[in-house]
């Protein structure tokens, strides 16, 4: 391996000559050999979009030459095309402001831009990482800006489409199953009837609510900290910078961003991300409930509830031949647990905004993006490999429906609650049907029982 000598304000340091990064990135690599968690590539992409927009705006404001602006823009485009993906090796366990990652971007962009201008960054840097790429910026405002940019983009382009696909499937299943009457269950005990379609409509409504909660959380995530520089005052930044960068980012990404109205808030608090992740946690709770319901309803095949048949995707046991497990449901529930854990970490980290700056930014955005990615991927997987293939086991559903003692509820208006309870308890004690019990107790005639106890008429309120 060949090395070159790079320098920063702390002196000289050896850097792998094949890499574009510089001294500060190298120091971070050597000083923070902690864990395996690296800065997410999605965050690096958002940072590149931000640096690109800043190069455009700094030129428009007369602070950066056209030549340097265009070189920086082209270097950022190289990052966005994936041409420099091996240049961002830093761990999330670094300074809590994300300074090392900001400088990682600055150094790589500066050296690539120098090459674009025809120079050799190993000999002389035509673009300076601080003076040019980081012009009018601080890590304290660029990192939280990149956090919000990546959050909005990933929610818009990854999470919401996956959620919408699963929601669509449950809406379709709700219609497909609307004529299938089944027994309901509360407290894990038999309850009154409903249709399988009604049950699935509940799942669809849960996901619709989650979608709306996530959409609502987007509004404050659109607010960008850029222009606040070190402590929120905007020192060394043009007064029009923040508004113009938000406009440029919006135009370039095709997604709306605005300048945060209070930069002191934007630097020291991450309540917008904590709030958005709260919506993720609510979605995870809904997905956990749905996946659990489906695997219980599909339990069996001979000794469980068995009301649903789910796709058989792979062998389920290394010792029991022919066993097939609800693997997609299990994967979904594990994702939900991880998201709930991430929510706790984000909540604690977001509370640590001491004075003018929160210094838990990397761990906040790492966990946020992990939750987003896991939710998106698991919903897509669950939809394709499980939800879309769910079918009712009508024989089992009908058996449970007509053997449930809770059909006695339909008799309340005719014989009263206490007499209805006597019918149910007598039937359960003697192992006979509700009809047989009612006749034995001489509370109803056979004709009246058949008229009053009709499961298909018990699935909605009466006129």
UniProtKB/Swiss-Prot annotation:
Its main location: cytoplasm. It is found in: Cytoplasm. The record marks 330 as: Important for catalytic activity. Signal peptide: none annotated. It is an enzyme of class 4 (lyase). The keyword rRNA-binding does not apply. It catalyses: (S)-malate = fumarate + H2O. Disulfide bonds: none annotated. GO terms for cellular component: cytoplasm. One of its GO terms (biological process) is fumarate metabolic process. The active site is at 187 (proton donor/acceptor), 317. Transmembrane segments: none annotated. Keywords: Cytoplasm, Lyase, Tricarboxylic acid cycle. It comes from the Bacteria. One of its GO terms (molecular function) is fumarate hydratase activity. Substrate binds at residues 97-99, 128-131, 138-140, 186, 318, 323-325. Its EC number is 4.2.1.2. There are 2 substrate-binding sites: the catalytic A site, and the non-catalytic B site that may play a role in the transfer of substrate or product between the active site and the solvent. Alternatively, the B site may bind allosteric effectors. Belongs to the class-II fumarase/aspartase family. Fumarase subfamily. Involved in the TCA cycle. Catalyzes the stereospecific interconversion of fumarate to L-malate. NCBIfam families: fumC_II, PRK12273.1. Homotetramer. This is Fumarate hydratase class II. It comes from Helicobacter pylori (strain J99 / ATCC 700824) (Campylobacter pylori J99). The gene is fumC.
């Amino acid at each position: 391996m060949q090395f070159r000598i790079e320098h920063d304000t702390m002196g000289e340091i050896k850097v792998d000559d094949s890499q574009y990064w510089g001294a500060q990135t190298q120091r971070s690599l050597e000083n923070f050999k902690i864990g395996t968690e690296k800065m997410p590539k999605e965050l690096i992409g958002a940072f590149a979009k931000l640096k690109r927009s800043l190069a455009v705006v700094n030129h428009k404001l007369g602070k950066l030459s056209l030549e340097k602006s265009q070189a920086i823009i082209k270097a950022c485009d190289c990052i966005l095309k994936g041409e420099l993906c091996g240049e961002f090796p830093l761990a999330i366990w670094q300074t809590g402001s994300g300074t090392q990652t900001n400088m990682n971007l600055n150094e790589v962009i500066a050296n690539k831009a120098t090459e674009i201008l025809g120079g050799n960054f190993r000999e002389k840097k035509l673009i300076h990482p601080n003076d040019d790429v980081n012009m009018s910026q601080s890590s304290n405002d660029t990192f939280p800006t990149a956090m919000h940019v990546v959050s909005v983009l990933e929610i818009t382009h990854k999470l919401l489409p996956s959620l919408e696909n699963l929601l669509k499937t449950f809406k379709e299943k709700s219609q497909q199953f609307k004529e299938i009457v089944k027994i309901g269950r509360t407290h894990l005990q038999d309850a009154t009837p409903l249709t399988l379609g009604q049950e699935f409509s509940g799942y669809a409504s849960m996901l619709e609510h989650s979608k709306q909660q996530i959409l609502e959380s987007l509004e404050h995530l659109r607010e960008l900290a850029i222009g606040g520089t070190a402590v929120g005052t905007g020192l060394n930044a043009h007064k029009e910078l923040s508004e113009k960068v938000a406009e440029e980012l919006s135009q370039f990404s095709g997604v709306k961003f605005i300048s945060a109205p209070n930069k002191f808030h934007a630097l020291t608090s991450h309540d917008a991300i904590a709030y958005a992740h709260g919506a993720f946690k609510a979605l995870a709770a809904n997905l956990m409930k749905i996946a659990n319901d489906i695997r219980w309803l599909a339990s069996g095949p001979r000794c469980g509830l068995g009301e649903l048949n789910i796709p058989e995707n792979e062998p389920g046991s290394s010792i029991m031949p022919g066993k097939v497990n609800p693997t997609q449901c299990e994967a979904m529930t594990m994702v939900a647990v991880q998201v709930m854990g991430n929510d706790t970490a984000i909540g604690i980290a977001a509370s640590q905004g001491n004075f003018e700056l929160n210094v838990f930014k990397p761990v906040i955005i790492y966990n946020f993006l992990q939750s987003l990615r896991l939710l998106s991927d698991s919903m897509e997987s669950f939809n394709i490999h499980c939800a879309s293939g769910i079918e009712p086991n009508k024989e089992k559903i009908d058996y449970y429906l007509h053997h449930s003692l809770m059909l006695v509820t339909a008799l309340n208006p005719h014989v009263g609650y206490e007499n209805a309870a006597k019918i149910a308890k007598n039937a359960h004690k003697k192992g006979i049907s509700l009809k047989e019990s009612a006749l034995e107790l001489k509370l109803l005639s056979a004709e009246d029982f058949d008229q009053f106890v009709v499961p298909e008429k018990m699935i909605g309120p009466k006129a």
